[in-house]
């Protein structure tokens, strides 16, 4: 039986859950060789998730696939413990990306619709996130919808990234700002 929720005075059925997050490797859109998925990882909509060869996913991480988005994680990428990735708006992570523990990557947000209704009940808008090859996302950083992190870029611990990061840039802070550019 569906639970009823009130939305602006009208009762409507609550949408079904996306499931428990439990998964089988055979459910993934693609899973490469030598993939390590630690205990306690939850994967929602694994049929929309692709993991390349040699990907590591740390314990307690949530890969929140979405029925109409794709999540693609490239070969050799390392995902630390207790990360949260949401791919309603498509998420593409390149090869050999280092992702520290507790990183959040979000591809959706609530649309601004004024104060006539609660934010929770506003439309969901999506925007893809791209993290290019060889980038590094520091512990606890947050990547917001629509952001493109360039090749070899480095995001500092705890940074909130709301705009694009150029290739080989080092950014940090809230909001994230350019600190320097990496050189050979």
Q: Which residues does each PLM region occupy?
A:
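C-terminal/domain-terminus segments
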Residues: 148-172
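Flexible, glycine/small-residue-enriched loop-and-beta-strand segment within the central core
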Residues: 15-18, 40-51, 56-147, 174-175, ...
């Amino acid at each position: 039986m569906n639970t009823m929720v009130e939305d602006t005075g009208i009762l409507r059925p609550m949408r079904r859950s996306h499931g428990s997050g439990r998964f089988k490797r055979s459910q993934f859109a693609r899973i490469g060789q030598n993939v390590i998925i630690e205990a306690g990882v939850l994967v929602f909509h694994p049929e929309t998730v692709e993991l390349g060869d040699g990907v590591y996913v740390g314990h307690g991480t949530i890969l929140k696939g979405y029925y109409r988005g794709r999540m693609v994680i490239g070969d050799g990428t390392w995902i630390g413990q207790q990360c949260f990735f949401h791919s309603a708006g498509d998420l593409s992570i390149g090869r050999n990306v280092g992702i520290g523990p507790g990183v959040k990557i979000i591809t959706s947000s609530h649309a601004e619709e004024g104060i006539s209704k609660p934010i929770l009940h506003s439309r969901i808008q999506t925007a893809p996130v791209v993290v290019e090859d060889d980038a590094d996302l520091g512990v606890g950083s947050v990547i917001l919808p629509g952001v493109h992190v360039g090749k070899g870029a480095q995001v500092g611990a705890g940074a909130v990234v709301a705009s694009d990061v150029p290739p080989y840039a080092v950014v940090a802070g809230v909001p994230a700002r350019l600190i320097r550019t990496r050189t050979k």
